[in-house]
Amino acid sequence: MIFSYKHLKKLANLNEISFEDVIKAFNLIGFEVEETKEIRHVENIKYGKVLKIYKNENSDNLTVCEIQFKDKIRIIQTTAKNVEINKYVMAFIPGSKLANNLIESKLLKGIISEGMLVGFDEMLGFEIKLVPKELSKNVIVLDEANLNEDPIANLELHDYLIDLAILPNRSDAISYLVMAKELAAFFGTKIDNDLICLKNLRVSKINSNLEGIFVKSKTLELKLYDKYLLLKSHLKLTNTYKDLENLILIHTGMPIHFLNLKSLEKVNIVSKSSSLEIANRTLKIDNNLVIEKSREIIAIPYLETQKEFEIKDSQKEFFIFMNILSPKEVRKTIKTLKLESSQIKQATKTISHGMQLNAIQYMQSLFEEIEIVNINLNLKPKEILFDHTFINRIAGFEIVKEQKFINAKKSLEILGFKFFEDKILVPAYRHDYTGPYDVIEELFRFYGYDNFPILQPEIKPFKIQKKYDFKFSLASKNYNEIKTYSLVAKEDNNFDPFNFKTEILMKTFPSEKRRIIRNSQAFSLLEIAEYNIKRKLEKINFFDFGMINEGKRALIFASNEKSFNEIKKDLFSLFSYKFELRKTKNNYLHPNASAHIFYENKLIGWMGKINPSLKISDLIFVEILLDEFNISKNQFKEYNFDPLKFRDITFSIEKNQSIDTYLKELKKIKNIFEVQIIDKFEKNEKLNITVRILLEDDAIKNLDEAILKNSWN
């Protein structure tokens, strides 16, 4: 969008801020300045009051005007037909410049003309296509003017145009009022006009899906200053109500559509297919959005209006359509009708309800009386969490304690943000906010990316984390990998060695056989084993990695060739941890050939056979939950060439007492390699159990100390 530097400066109260500083500010807060252009097309023009008009008898086209200026009365001739007595004009007097051409007195058809009157074409040097023919032929005539004032200053004819590239998600910033707020936030000034303050407004709910305002206004006119502002934005002047639509658009970013309606009875916006005669053209509408009254199309939103429902310049009551339409539907309308307008182009972007409110507040200053229709004025601001620790982590240093960061928060407060201890309230017009990262980006752009300290990154050599290859190890132990489904039928999910509390039933599933996440991989593996046995492949040594209930990763391996102790050795050789096997009372496992696997008193798996009441099988299983502990490889230790020693210890315990307590204490002693029971006998109502301990020399001392401490035999 093209912005006027002088108009932005006035809105944002930037009295002492130069053009160069404004350009720098735009670039620093994230708006790319694509192009700038200085406007200095005229010099030294003056206001004058028309005292007398008469025809030049020597010419068919020239009219002689006697005009009172601040210093004296001058005679200026013109071909324009709209000059009236007691009206005011602007004129180039001798010594003025038009496009660097010096204006001097000149003899025209026998009468000296002391300058020339100013029209739209002369004023800014814009292309003629922006000005209607009727305006192009005439000069500018004013009802009031102060001869002591300077029209160049009043109309800001010496200005800079700033063409800004604005990101698609910032449709709110395609407006003077929001962009002025951005500058005010950067420079720490305050805008006089509070965009969010909406008071003493009449609000109505009407049986129609149209949103907007009813307007009552004594006059419908556009000031000359505003017309030039539209020309600066490269918007064509057409008629009063179209120019007002564009003026509201460039100030608020809200597309609007004026309609000659005094009520919304039987008026709605609908999708329709039809052939429509409008604006001397035939338009074919193909399921596009239209505004209809009593099922007759009266307008295409933000694009065209039937003549009967257009606003007349003298009209005092009308309706302003302000619906927020689907950008997809708007683009479809443009594609179908191959027509465009500044309003509908803006409607292709995301428009927020906050932008609606900004437009209503701005229109309060334009019209005497407005009535809100079907628009909610009490918008709840979006809340976003505000975590100082998180912001510091993203910044890479303690940014929240910096004065520049505190100033950045104050800048956001000027934009309408409200800060609390743990949250931020985002102004309603900022639809681009979705989470904490958006808040951080906003704070950082006002903190200034140039203010971030330049830190040398700490360079470290790459750490290669080797993944332990269970597959290779299991394959070396004569196991074959299989693949099973994580989903099973509900009736096949009766085996639960881990005692999960709930079942995960899928909302969408390929079939009833694949509906629930299994509690164990055992029955899936068993199903494949039985299939292979039926095919006369009777030697089973399988393993699989998969997911079970609660999303846990598990490893399972099973064999009908190996014994319990052989599979136990396979388990302990896979991991570098001291797992503990405990006798299980789980009804799903074989009571005499199964155990639970614990690590640091935490259940991490099971080993053994399935309870015959569930399934008769000679397979011995091991199933481990891989996420319950950190998997690491065995660490290298220098080899000790000394032969291992063994010690035998006999424990005398009660008949109903378990030997496990003593075995646990023995296994805590470092460099003990093996503890096994070698003998049992009863004597004097006591159970005597002899264990053999295989250990290194340096463990003997620790073992002796433990024997004395615990009074073992």
From Swiss-Prot:
One annotated Gene Ontology cellular component of this protein = phenylalanine-tRNA ligase complex
Which SMART domains does this one have?
Answer: B3_4, B5
**Keyword ATP-binding listed:** yes
Q: Where is the tRNA-binding domain?
A: 39-153
Q: Which cofactor does it need?
A: Mg(2+)
List ligand-binding residues for Mg(2+).
432, 438, 441-442
Do you know which NCBIfam families this protein is assigned to?
PRK00629.5-4
Identify the PANTHER family for this entry.
PHENYLALANINE--TRNA LIGASE BETA SUBUNIT, PHENYLALANYL-TRNA SYNTHETASE BETA CHAIN AND LEUCINE-RICH REPEAT-CONTAINING PROTEIN 47
Protein name as annotated: Phenylalanine--tRNA ligase beta subunit
Q: What is the lineage of its organism?
A: Bacteria, Bacillati, Mycoplasmatota, Mycoplasmoidales, Metamycoplasmataceae
Q: Corresponding gene?
A: pheT
